[in-house]
Structure formats: C-alpha cells, structure tokens
Amino acid sequence: MSDFTTPELLAPAGDWAALKAAVAQGADAVYFGVEAFNARLRAENFQLQDLGEIMDWLHARGVRGFLTFNVLVFSDELSKAAELLVAADQARVDALIVQDLGLCRLAQQLVPGLALHGSTQMSITSAAGVAQAADAGCERVVLARELALKDLRRLQNQLRDRQLAMPLEVFVHGALCVAYSGQCLTSESLGQRSANRGECAQACRLPYQMVVDGQALDLDDQRYLLSPQDLSAWMQIPELVELGIASFKIEGRLKDATYVAAATQAYRQQLDGLASDPAAVRRQLEMGFSRGLSTGWLEGINHRRLVHGRWSKKRGPVVGQLQRWDDQGWLTLKVQEPLQCGQGVVLEAQPRVGADPLVPPAEIGGRIMQLDDLGRGRCRIRLGPGRINLRGLQSGASVWLTGDPQWQTTWQKQATRSTDPLALPLSLRVKGVQGEPLALELVDPVPVGAPPLRLHSSVALQQATGQGLDRGRLEAQLGRLGGTGWRLESLEVELEEQLFLPVAELNRMRRTLLEQMQVCGLTPGSALPTKPVPPPETVATALHQCLAAARGADPVVPESGAPRLVVLVRSLPQLEALIALDRPDWIAGVVADLEQPSELKRAVALGRGQWPEGLRLAGPRITRPDEAWTLEPLVRAEPDGYLVRNADQLERLTPLAPCSGDFSLNTANPLTLDWYRKRWGLDRLTASYDLNLDQLLDLASGTNPNWLEVTLHQHMPLFHMEHCLFCAFLSDGHDHTDCGRPCEKHEVRLRDRSGVEHPLTADLGCRNTLFNGRAQSGVEALPDLLRAGLTRFRLELLDEDPIATQRRVQLYAQALEGSIPSADVWRREQIDHRLGVTRGSLRSVGPERTSRIHS
C-alpha cells in the first residue's frame, strides 16, 4: 500500500469485473459505489450487502477501498444515509468520498473513525476550499479538474503557509465535465435529473448552435460546443509527482473492465518508471475509450484545444486518411498502421448544403470485411456487414479505429488475470522450560468472542545433546505457512537454553494452531477484528441529536412583518428601476451581481438606505488559487452585506458585514444549513436548486424557516464552466490574454435541438454561465411556501430592461401580499415570456420525490 509520500493510483470500479481488473493491473486503491447515494447511478454498482465481501477481497490483496457517497443528501434521507455510514464502517471501508457537509457532520457523530475524502463535487479550487473541507472533517480532498499544474503548485504553497497538511487528489485520466463538478444544474433544470444526485443526462454532449447578436453563426462542422475531449495526463505524471500530489485518480465507473485494465496499467507503469513507448501507450488509452485525448486544463487554459466541437462520441486513434472510393464500396486509404479484417473503422461524412446544424453529421463506418494491402502504407478495404452508404465522403477524411478484436482479447485477458491474496501477518509467542511441554500462543490476530489461542506440545522439552532449539529453528518450522494465507510476522521466544523438541512435534503444533484459528473464524479474509454493530436505536438517537442541534433549542418565532422580496439585479439600469418603484416596501433587500468591478461602488451608492436589508454584493461562484484579487473590489465597495458563493468569500467577507449563502453552497438538509450558520454566521441560505418543492418543504420543517431564502423566479444557471465559448469560437485567441474580449462586444446564446436559445454570460474571471432560456417560476407553490413559514423570496433578473424589471417585481410582490392569486401570476408569466415559464425544480412530485434512493 502507498502512504502519503508515495503517490497512490486510484482506479474506478462500476462492477466486480472492473474492480478485479483494477487490482490485477496494480491499482493501490479502488473507488466504487453501492446502489444509492453515489454520483454514478447509471453504473451497475454494487449491492450494500456485498460491501463486506468487497472490502475483505481488496484488503486480502493489500488494496484500499473507497466508497463513493458523493451526492447531496435530502432531509428525508438522513436516516438511510446514517445506516449506510454504519454499514461502511462495519465493512472496514477505508474512506468515504463525500460531497455533503451535513453528511460529514453526521459521519463524525456516528462513525468518527471512518476517514472522509472531499469529493470533486465540493468544487474545491483554492486553499480556502481545502481548509473548509478540513474543518468539516475531511482527511483528503479531490481537487477540481479545472486547476492547472501552476495552480496546483501555488495551492501547495498556500497550504504550507496555512500550515495545513492536506493530501491532495487529482484526476489524471478520463471524461471531463465542461461544468465545474458540483455546480452543474443542467440535468436538473432541463430534465429533473440532478448531476448532484448521480443522474447526469450528459447535455454537454449534445449539439448546439451559437447565435451571436441575433444571427446564427456558421461554425462549419463544429456542433458540440460544450463537449470537451477526454483527459490524459500520462505525460504529466512526473511533474505531478514532483508537486507532491498524494493520489492520481482515473475516471470511469461507467466504463468496462478492459478500459479499467488498460488505463490502470498505463499509469501504473508510468508511476513505476517502466513505460518506454509513449505512442504505444497513447494508442492503448485511445482504444480503451476516447473522445480525443488532451491534457485538459493541466497545461493551462486553451479553450480552442479543450473543445474541438466536431464530435462527442467515442472514437479511437486516427489510423489513416481516405484517398478515394468507388461504386463497389472499396475505400483506398493511406494508413499509419496495418489494418486487419474484423477491425471497426469510422469516417465522417460531409454535411449536406443547407443541412440542419443541430443534426449530427452522418458517420460512415463498420467492420472491415475485405482488405487488400497495396504497399507503401496504402490499402483498400470494404466495410460491412451489408452494403454501406458512402454518400458524403470526402477525400482526405480521417479514418478512426473504433474497434479491434485483438486489442479486446488482449485486454480481456489482462482484466481477468488472477490476483492471489497476500499472506497476512501472524504474531506468535513460545515459552518453555526443561521437563515441561512447549507452549505456543497466538498473539495477533486475536479471536473475537473466544479465549486466547494457546496449545502445548504433547511431549516435554528435554535437554539437547546436540544443537538446541533457538529462534532460527523455531522460525523455520513455525513459519512454514505457504498456501495458508498467513505469514510469520514476529515470534517472541522465552526459552531456556539447550532444549530439544522433535521437528515433527513443532510441525504438528503449527498445523493444530491453524486448525483452531479456522474454528474460531480467523481466516485470512476475516483477520481484522469485527466492529461491534450499534443497535438501531443508537443510530436513531445520534441522528435525532444532530437534527435537534441543527434546529436549535429555541422555538421558531416568525419574522415580524409581511413576507418580502429579495431582488437580484445584474445591471445598473435594473437597480435604478427598483429605486424608482412606487412601493419600495415590497422589497426587503437587493443583491447586485455585476460583472464589472468599476460598477460596484456606484451600485452601493445608489442602493444605500433604500431597503431595510440594504444592498448586498455578490461575487463569482469560483475563486482559483491566484484570484484572491477578485474579492477586493467587493471589499472596497463597502456594501451593506454580501451574498457569498464559495469558501474564499466565506473566509474573506463574513467578518466584514452580514452575509447570506447562495445556492452554490449546496445546502440540501438541516445539518448542512446548521454547519454554515454556526461556522460562518450566515443569516440565511438559499437551498440547493436540486431540491424540488416537497424536499424544500421538508428542509423548512426540519430547521428554522427564517434561515432560508427561496428563489421564486429565475433563469436557472445550467453550466458554470471554466471553458469560455466567446474565446473558443469568436476569437483566434486561446485565453483571456489574447482573445480580444468578445464577451464585451457581443450577445451570445446557444440554441438547442428544441429551438430554445440559452443566454451565455462571462464573469470577472472569464468563466461562462449558460442560463436556461426558459425562466423558472415557483409562484404556484407560494401558498405552500408561506404556510411553511418562509418569509424571504428571491426574484432573480437576467437581461430584463427597466420596464420589465418593474413589472416583474410588482407582479410577484402582489402575489406575496395576496392581492393577485398565484395561479394568475403563473398565467401572466406564461404570456410575458416568449418561451413561457417552467416550474423546473420547484415542482411537486409527491410520494416519488426521493427518486431512486429508496428503490
């Protein structure tokens, strides 16, 4: 096993075959999920009752096992979560990979000895994020994939300055999400399938059309504008080792055993200094699974390289180019490696003139049924089975190798290579004096629920006439444990000198000891002591105590005054429109979320004294290791308070003024809400947008509803990403240093296959947010929310002009005070919005509200 100073190779396992493949190819640790509470619900996953068997199998081979618990946990699931925590502890899981801070708190209460690793779903991009995870009890953190090598170096230095020794884990291979993990709401908003719940719908892999200033932009064959190439940091391993990264993680719990075997072996050999042929390794990895391999963000931001936009499905290595073809279906190729019958290839067809840009171009491919070698790196092939339509082919088209039976056979053998259990250590003690039997005692492991194992020789020790018993002879005979699964680790000897016992008797004693160990249940697969199982009432009591502490001892007292709005504006004209309203009493406070730092002081000056809770400022959702400067304009503006969105803002801004927490903090249960309030003194939090109406009401009933703020109207942020589409497709640059800032000159939307155009914005750090083109309104649920005791309702503006701003505020304010029925507001919103509005996450789904967790 690796320790903190030796990089760990961590491989994925979605089933037993993948788990065994990872171990066969040298993984130090494996991460996997059970049927609920993990971020890959589409994987086969394991059953909870198999957890003990999995861990015994791994531990017998010297491999660690990490259980993924990397989702948000809803209020009504906490009891089930507690049961899984206890089960993981019972099974001797080496660590839980977690996202939910409330779950961390529950784990510390129930299973304090179980290690916690902060998931990449925690969106950790800075030293403040690492420190927050440490405060929550994490012993390791998985960093966001968006950090470059230079960011990792800077982060390590910042952690040293804080004297925080936290092992860091980074992804080195596999699929890349275009959005920050833990911050993607696309599946939730468009299909009520939350990525924060393991149900990502892969909307980033779909085609989109860029609409610039109202006109569709012709991007030729670039349709997959949000689909990154896959990550392959094989060549960067030496530098990552030098940076002191503790664990290298391979993505792929949805992949098969051959992928896991090929990827694990490649990185194992690179870590061990055994790799010698980079081209062969790249082909090995491309055949495993590849949408095109890149270094992701590790070598710095290059938006044009990260997303090529031409395809989003699996393709293997490029093996040639098309030279010509004929009516009989023969394709003449210039090839980079010899092809064989039975292999699969694919070529791209040129789209027809006037073809729908949101319809993927045709692919021409199949199995090679016939092959003629033409010499000099040329061949001709016919594809099948059946007749292949070659319409749309173009000379010079690339040829990808998508399947290779020989590769599959080779890696199937590698994936199923047997791995014998390691011999586990035995500690023994022998005692003896002349004239008495020799005593043999098992020191470690100790049988549970049985007396210590001791046995005696059947004959007494005698005076030796030749060489007597000594440590060497005893170790030689008692250590003959080959094939038993045990090895002699230590032997304590308390013997008088020059004593004799027949070798046959020593051998008998060894065999008898092993038999008695088996009777006591001490087998190599169960050598670790079993932990006592806490009774169900103990678990229930611990959970009840946590929830009671989160709710607080004092009775809930409704806030004085009528429920009111908190309005979030994204422009100064919107702010000025609010100030000009005839009824300022409709609004409790305003949040200004402005891209330009130069506008912040102006916004504060305009809003000062206008509303009871004043004007608060909101910062970016992400702060990288070199971006502390982005917080300083917020500080210098001296607002009445802040809407905080990440750990850096919590650290920097909460000491300065009243703060509330935004949805990006991922508050889904009372324990998380209580953690943020007590740790940072937040006056309110906006719950995670992954909660539907019923789950939001559950949260309100389990805490003080005065601590919650509900967003009644918004354009849901779909993707929040480091990738900048303005730079990638509207400039010849690679990042913010040479892009020319097209984001300041153009209005951009992405049109999806249903015709909806989704607005795109860039923040101060050049990160892009794609908003849902259809607004979400929870106004129909307003009566239920008011009955639950909620009093603060956010209205988020996006690109409304001043007139639309005032009309929307007036409409929702009148709904709050009861002068307009909620159903009427919903109907008016359907009319006012060109695309109508959606209930989105604030829908009620009744008894099925917890999706697949309890299935």
What are these regions (language model features)?
Residues 2-124, 128, 150-247, 254-398, ...:
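Active-site pocket-lining/capping segments in soluble small-molecule metabolic enzymes
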Residues 144:
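His/Asp/Glu-rich metal-coordinating catalytic cores
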Residues 139-140, 406:
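Long, basic N-terminal domains or extensions that often function
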